[in-house]
Amino acid sequence: MELGLKKDEVKIVPYNAQWKSEFERVKKLMLHVLNVNESQIEHIGSTAIKGMKAKPIIDILLGVENLQCIDRILEKALYSIGFYRLRVERENEVVFAKFADEGFETKTHFIHAVKFNGKIKKNLIFFR
């Protein structure tokens, strides 16, 4: 399965049914290390839409009660399964990424942590 993009790289690839399996695999890992319900983790973005061409990056939504609860414990838990908090500044969203290489050049997964019942979550789910 082709997965990942380098910084500033743009690539659209044909739909791959393995994207769903990869999301499910990562979701299980997240459920194992985080104190969240299954309903708080969802596959979003173009790889979540069956049959659609997409950028080969798995986007995952993590719904939290509030963004202030994203503390060192949650960051360490996500780090333990290979995710790094990005310095991306987005209002009402914290972004984590997983990389395919030790040089942190090729991103394969994003976790978008947003308020569980907030507007951003609704917009991200609506796209799907």
Predicted regions and their residues:
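Catalytic core of pol beta-like nucleotidyltransferases
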Residues: 1-55, 64-75, 79-128
